[in-house]
């Protein structure tokens, strides 16, 4: 199916793709995304590798939530989910560019 030169070229392309994907993954690990809830009263900053870097809770919310711990917990959870979803979307867009046009499952070989 492939000649020696063709197979060698294909392997070289695969290695280059793998290197490029590793660079993209490293960049994503440093890319910060912000999720929020309660119209910005709770903000969470995380990387596309799901490392939470910062949680910001409005002082107004802290005073308001003094009597409603459950509301504060719900807002933190919602902001965390928002950040996670944005991180996943960003990572999928970035990594999807490498596997576009490949048969399903083949892109997993390069991860």
From Swiss-Prot:
GO cellular component entries: bacterial nucleoid; cytosol
Locations listed in the record: Cytoplasm, Nucleoid
Similarity annotation: Belongs to the YbaB/EbfC family.
Keyword flag Iron: no
Keyword Cytoplasm on entry: yes
UniProt protein name: Nucleoid-associated protein NMA1657
Record SUPFAM superfamilies: YbaB-like
PANTHER family found in the cross-reference section: NUCLEOID-ASSOCIATED PROTEIN YBAB
Organism: Neisseria meningitidis serogroup A / serotype 4A (strain DSM 15465 / Z2491)
